[in-house]
Amino acid sequence: LTAAPGKEPGPAPAPGQYDLGIERARDTLLYVPAALRQGRPAPLTLLLHGAGGDAAGGLGLLSGYAEEHRLVLAAPSSRTSTWDGVRGVFGTDVKAINRALEQIFQLVFVDPNRIAIGGFSDGASYALGLGLANGGLFAKIIAFSPGFIPPALRTGRPHIFVSHGDRDNVLPIDRTSRRLVPLLNREGYNVTYREFRGGHAVPPEITQEAIEWLGWE
């Protein structure tokens, strides 16, 4: 990714949910909280949907907390049914995400030290791969029920939050997070890991903990 936040772009956009208008189909959604403070850089979290999903599904991961915590949220859609890196090659989805970030940085005054990437299921796997490859951009990564980490050259040392249900029959925990988290720990990453009783889902208490872990308002 080459997009990077810059100087304050001008008046803050009106609060609400927007299509960015940069893709003919499966556009990126941007959510601007009413509590956004003019003249103060805001935290941004990029959210990635699971397989078969779209931007609305990604946005819904944290949208219920955006107002209280003054979070700007952005949710792209994969170009096909899931993210390209999950299929083994980073390509068109990375380009679309970069276009979206460039547009967002022109609209919103974003704090360069408070940018996160997160996702659920395939989106969590992609968030890990893209986040670890762009650790100079993303300070934190949230991975709800990831399957694996797509290989890529890594930069920076983002902090990582991982959650997984102990009864997940889509991405069974013994083959996924219980292997990934120790690996990340051995590689020196700061990882917060939460298992919960349940399946392939993101329970409200896990979402709440992830928000508190972000610590951004």
Residue locations for each model-derived region?
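A domain-start/cap signature at the N-terminus of enzymes
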Residues: 1-44, 89-92, 122, 130, ...
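Serine-hydrolase catalytic machinery in alpha/beta-hydrolase-like enzymes
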Residues: 13-29, 34, 39-109
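Primarily recognizes the serine-hydrolase "nucleophile elbow" in alpha/beta-hydrolase
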Residues: 58, 105, 113-157
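Histidine-bearing beta->alpha loop at or near hydrolase active sites
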Residues: 80, 194-202
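Short, proline-enriched alpha-helix->beta-strand connector loops that line the catalytic pocket
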Residues: 155-160, 187-189
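Short beta-strand/loop motif that positions the catalytic acidic residue
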Residues: 161-164, 168
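Conserved alpha/beta-hydrolase "acid-adjacent" motif
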Residues: 169-176
